[in-house]
Structure formats: structure tokens, C-alpha cells
Amino acid sequence: MRIMEDGTTTHAGVKDAPTKENVNGTLASIGATVFIPWSLMFIPKIFYFYLTPKMDMRPILFFMILVTKIADTGAFAAGSWTAKQPGGNHKLIPLVSPKKSWEGLIGGTVASVVTALICYFCWPASVSINGVKVFGIAEVIIIGILASVIGLLGDLAESALKRAAGAKDSGHLPGIGGILDTLDSLIFVSPLFYAYLNFAIANQAAQIMKFNQ
């Protein structure tokens, strides 16, 4: 059956061809439901990371999450404050995330490094496994810097997915939900931290094993 309307011929019961926006949204949702869960699965992998069942990874996992989320908080505070100053702040990638700024990145990095150093000196267990420090002070500073920078990349990646999907927040991405807005900074941090943790533990394996005997 054919229906003629305003000179346009369509087939009854046949849906319109998918638009570019719909295709982009579908691809973004697929990317979110595949790549992001794969990245975040490294969080439980760190928790269950062990050479023997006696290894307690909870403090070091909390350390990773803490310095990353503190970077988020510092970036938000610094970015919000500088945005209200005369002349505003300097945007990072306005097309992807209009509110992200260089001032926010600097503020987040300072907050992350300071938090990492506080953990190192005041809570040694957070950089240790069974009493053996796996991160030195220089490594802790580097981790603080990278947690801020790489965490920002995860945030930007999530923002790009949301824009491609035409969603204001990640709650509109099927299978992910608004929780992604909380975990976005860990998308790239968790797998990289896991990889570095493998390297650090390998260097300290002999000492760690002594404490497990």
C-alpha cells in the first residue's frame, strides 16, 4: 500500500531511515556499554589482586579512588571560583566539555598531589601491601599528577559519549545509568593503576612474600 502526502511517497508500516544523530547515539551507547565496564572492572581486579590470599589490597585501592576523586573536587572548586573572577577562566576543550578549564585542571592536580602526600606520610598502609611500601614519595607525587590528568581524560571521554548520544547526563545511556557521572574519572585511571601496580609489586615481591609467611 502506498500513501501519497505532499508529493512524497512512503510505504505504510515502514519506519523512517535512521538519522545521523540516531546512529551516533547508538554507537555511543554501544561504546559506553562495552568499553566503560571493561575499564571499570579493574577496580575489583585491584581489590582481589594478590600473590597469596593474605594480601590486603583495600587500603591501596582506596588510595587510588581517593586521589582521583579529590582531583575531581579540586578541579570543580578551582574551576568554579576562577569562572566567577573578572575575565573568567581558560577553557580546555569547550566543544566537548564547556565547563572544564585549565585552572580547574591545575587546582585538581594540586589537590590530588597534596592528598597523595598526606596519605603517604599519615597513612602508610595506603601505599603499602602487608606493611611493605610499594610506592615511594616520588611515585606518590607522580600518581597524584596522573590521577588528575588521566581522570580528566576519562571525564572528557564520557562527555564526548554523552554528546554523541545527545544525552545531557549518562543516565540516558542504556545499560550505564547516572552512576557513570560519578565513576567517569576512573575510566582510564583504574586500568593504568592496575598495570603500574603489577610492576610495583613485581619489584617488591620478595619482601611482600616474607610478610605472608
Cite the ranges covered by each PLM segment.
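Interhelical loop and helix-boundary elements at the membrane-water interface
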Residues: R2-F188, F211-Q213
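Juxtamembrane boundary at the C-terminal end of a transmembrane helix
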Residues: L197-Q213
